[in-house]
């Protein structure tokens, strides 16, 4: 590692590309991969406070990276850097067929309370400062002396007698053992009846170290829509308020929020692969809204990042830009003590709640606890009555028998049988709720793809340590 003028840290990173994605031309692929690097480096350094070398090793290394692009096409190093004073990162794409070509640099900028935003290709930091939507003023309250779950001060009293603490500690420790080729656990938190009864972190990670939630963010999107339903601003069973679909002749106008929540919009999509949306610096909501209809709404289940993006598009329409910018914190995060959770946006101010949220295991445990308590927090109803039951009801267009793990799907939550449900994100991110046992189990990871972590089995072993 060497230091350049202006406080920039330069890293040379090379990687194989393994994802099978929609076709992009060579310039787009180069730009998307550069955007991936700039965005990850920005969030890891300025949101999570991690060391750049560990980011390169643990997230952008050849063994762990599943980056956007065609297999084997973009193997040349990218030049990346960090400007700590300006709190931004950059990555310079290199065209694979011409070693002398340099693409337009990709910049990601950090803003307090909002995390990092990846800019469109070629956008300068000065231009971004003038064009990026404003961020509401916010600073994280100090929760260190506030009692759990609103804060982080844990009780000193003994654990409930039904918890076998030694056996539970051994089960949690087992999550951090085993071959690295199989899994790489970052953190585990276990709640029982609201109390934090077990917690452990990998070396170099701690209570306040954030990591990307990946698709666990979709369950957070569910909660935000629930808040708006409770306020009477949205109805899941009427056509979604997407401006691009308002033409009476547009068949997409029949798509409801229920269809979007249950991944049954019928829209054309590349499923969980959205390279341009995530790393291209485009208006992700407009891109999602432009998708044509493939099947009649409500007749097909297809997991799609863009169905979730469109939920937030609807939220922005009914709230307006200013209220939308403050909405995740005002409506949910700050109300339940999730002060170390940062939902990020595209450069047009759209929350990317299909994936792009940075959080901690404790904050995710708080989120699971909200659902365990039927949407009530400290006696205050945050989610409307019946919302949790609605969210955990099987989607009619998805058959659990079609999956090897037997998981069903509700409304932005996966269903594990009749009495538990979970959020699930790539590389092993899980927030699992078991209502009949009063248990929440959070596991975060940096697993190689495809992850071989068995969350169902892990939760079962945790439950064995807590007597009924």
What are these regions (language model features)?
Residues 230-266, 290-293, 319-355, 359:
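Active-site helix/loop module of the DD-peptidase/beta-lactamase fold
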Residues 52, 232-236, 316-329, 375-384, ...:
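Structural helix-adjacent loops and short alpha-helical linkers that scaffold large soluble proteins
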Residues 152-193:
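Beta-lactamase-like hydrolase cores
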Residues 194, 211-237, 260, 311-315, ...:
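Active-site SXXK
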């Amino acid at each position: 590692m060497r230091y350049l003028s202006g406080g920039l840290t330069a890293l040379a990173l090379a990687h194989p590309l393994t994802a099978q994605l929609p076709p992009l031309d060579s310039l787009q692929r180069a730009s998307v991969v550069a955007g991936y690097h700039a965005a990850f480096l920005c969030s890891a350094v300025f949101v999570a406070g991690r060391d750049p070398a560990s980011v390169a090793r643990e997230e952008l290394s050849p063994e762990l990276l599943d980056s956007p692009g065609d297999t084997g096409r973009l193997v040349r190093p990218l030049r990346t850097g960090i400007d700590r004073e300006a709190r931004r990162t950059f990555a310079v794409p290199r065209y694979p067929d011409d070693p002398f070509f340099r693409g337009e640099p990709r910049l990601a900028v950090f803003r307090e309370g909002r995390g990092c935003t990846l800019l469109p290709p070629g956008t300068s930091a000065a231009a971004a400062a003038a064009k990026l939507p404003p961020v509401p003023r916010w600073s994280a309250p100090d929760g260190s002396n506030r009692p759990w779950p609103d804060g982080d001060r844990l009780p000193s009293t003994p654990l409930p007698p039904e918890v076998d603490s030694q056996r539970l500690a051994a089960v949690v420790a087992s999550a951090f053992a085993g071959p690295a080729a199989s899994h790489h656990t970052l953190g585990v938190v276990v709640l029982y009846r609201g109390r934090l009864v077990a917690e452990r972190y990998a070396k170099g990670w701690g209570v306040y170290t954030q990591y990307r939630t990946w698709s666990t963010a979709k369950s957070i999107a569910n909660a935000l829509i629930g808040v708006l339903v409770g306020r009477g601003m949205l109805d899941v069973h009427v056509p979604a308020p997407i401006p691009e679909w308002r033409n009476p002749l547009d068949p997409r106008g029949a798509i409801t929020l229920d269809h979007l929540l249950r991944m049954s919009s019928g829209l054309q999509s590349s499923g969980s692969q959205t390279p341009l949306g995530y790393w291209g610096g485009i208006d992700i909501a407009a891109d999602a809204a432009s998708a044509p209809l493939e099947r009649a709404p409500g007749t097909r289940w297809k997991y799609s990042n863009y169905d979730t993006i469109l939920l937030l598009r609807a939220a922005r329409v009914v709230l307006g830009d200013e209220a939308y910018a403050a909405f995740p914190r005002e409506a949910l995060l700050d109300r339940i003590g999730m002060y170390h959770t940062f939902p990020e946006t595209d450069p047009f101010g759209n929350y990317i709640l299909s994936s792009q949220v940075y959080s901690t295991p404790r904050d995710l445990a708080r989120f699971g606890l909200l659902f365990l308590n039927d949407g009530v927090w400290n006696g205050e109803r945050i989610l409307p009555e019946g919302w949790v039951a609605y969210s955990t009801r099987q989607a009619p267009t998805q058959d659990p028998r079609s999956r090897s793990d037997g998981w069903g799907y509700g409304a932005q939550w996966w269903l594990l049988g009749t009495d538990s449900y979970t959020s699930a994100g790539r590389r092993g991110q899980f927030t699992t709720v078991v209502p009949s046992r009063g248990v929440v189990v959070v596991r975060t990871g940096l697993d190689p793809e495809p992850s071989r972590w068995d969350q169902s089995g892990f939760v079962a072993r945790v439950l064995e340590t807590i007597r009924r």
